[in-house]
Amino acid sequence: MTEHFDVVIVGAGISGISTAWHLQDRCPTKSYVILERRANIGGTWDLFKYPGIRSDSDMFTLGFRFKPWTSAKSIADGPSIWNYINEAAQENGIDKHIRTNHRVLGADWSDAENRWTITVEADGEQKQITASFLSVCSGYYNYDQGYSPEFPGADDFAGQIIHPQHWPEDLDYAGKKIVVIGSGATAVTLIPSLVNGGAAHVTMLQRSPTYIGSLPLVDPVAEKTNKYLPKNLAHFVNRWKAIAFSTAQYQLARKFPNYMRKTLMTMAQRRLPEGFDVQKHFGPRYNPWDERLCLAPNGDLFKTIRAGKADVVTDTIAKFTETGIKLTSGEELTADIIITATGLNMQLFGGASLTRNGQEVDLTETMTYKGLMLSGVPNMAITFGYTNASWTLKADLVSEFICRVLNYMDDNGFDRVEPQHPGDAVDALPFMDFNPGYFRRAMDSLPKSGSRAPWRLKQNYFFDLRMIRYDKVDEESLHFTKHRAAVSASSS
């Protein structure tokens, strides 16, 4: 017999655990299951194993609202974050609802049956589970394959070529010369860690620079609040201080980009060797926050460069050679290991198909409602966190909204909710005002956002807080209906 749940959650990372906790807290009668394709929970924090893997957002906001992050260490390493997520699941009994090694292949909404049928692969076999509501918490990138461009001559290189998404556990890089291709968060994290791990020298090879900011590894305010305030009050203060700071610096960057650019350049110059060309190597052509700002805790990357253990080369690749990389300028970089920190491949729904009555949903024809539902797709929410703040802030709001919608439907006898596309009343805009490579490569396959609320995706926590947590649920863009289908519910 096909199992049926009130809610099926896809993904057991931060978003999935947040959704489960909110369901237990606010919709305690709802049955649910979490389907996780990997052998462990944790999502990103279970996948990436490269040296130095850490958060690039503060833990007071990357952590859950319901589980205080009690350390004053605001930037945490990957294993600590994985342990934190695992503890959150175990402490709240969420782990009992998680089915690992369950890969979702597709989800089909039936208007006639008024439910989702989710096709899952587990233990080499396919089976189906049905749900009244679907919560997609599978992130936004391809877990199987990172982005790696074609490099001429790659087969000629005598050393190892490694993508950080598939880091070998037994890699010995002590005493080796390493070239890291890329200048994003992964490269910025890797370089100091490789040096600390014994690499002879590391070169960051970038086609163009990235803005890099520096923050204390240990938050001085949190040190005091954690010492003198009760745990929950300290968490409240630390969290809201972090929210206010990140929001303010983002808004400042967008309104006064030249000021923010100058500030970042000055901060970098102070930490780098005398005569270092900061503009060439850390001065992008775009404005701050057109792409995500990278973080160097305690300025670790700058310190590594200053110590002579690492350097930066801004150039393009002509070809790989047997001993390294030849650049278009004619310079050659020798290397024992080349790491291609060249980014992600964007992928919504974890690669699963999304259909309605057996017909594929064309995402490019949909519009995001409050950044968490799609027009023309009933009884489904998708969690897509912030690009300019902690992912979890948005994940928590999405989880709250799911519960508000489910409770409203129960209270009023509805069983279907569907955002109605506004048509010509709202101009269609790109999914997000964000411009890194992985977004640009996927833009033609993404949903649209709208020119005004509730269709506009603003990447602003305070705007979303009002719109998602406090605005009324029963507004004209969200269509609630009754379609009672005879679904026999059984759940574990």
Swiss-Prot record:
InterPro entries, A to Z: FAD-binding_MO, FAD/NAD-bd_sf, Flavin_mOase-like
Keyword Cell membrane on entry: yes
This protein's name: FAD-containing monooxygenase EthA
Keywords per UniProt: Cell membrane, FAD, Flavoprotein, Membrane, Monooxygenase, NADP, Oxidoreductase
Gene (name only): ethA
Enzyme Commission number(s) of this protein: 1.14.13.-
Lineage summary: Bacteria, Bacillati, Actinomycetota, Actinomycetes, Mycobacteriales
Residues annotated as site: Transition state stabilizer: 292
Induction: Repressed by the transcriptional regulator EthR.
GO CC, any one term: plasma membrane
Protein species of origin: Mycolicibacterium smegmatis (strain ATCC 700084 / mc(2)155) (Mycobacterium smegmatis)
Function: Monooxygenase able to convert a wide range of ketones to the corresponding esters or lactones via a Baeyer-Villiger oxidation reaction. Can act on long-chain aliphatic ketones (2-hexanone to 2-dodecanone) and on aromatic ketones (phenylacetone and benzylacetone). Is also able to catalyze enantioselective sulfoxidation of methyl-p-tolylsulfide. In vivo, likely functions as a BVMO, but the exact nature of the physiological substrate(s) remains to be established.
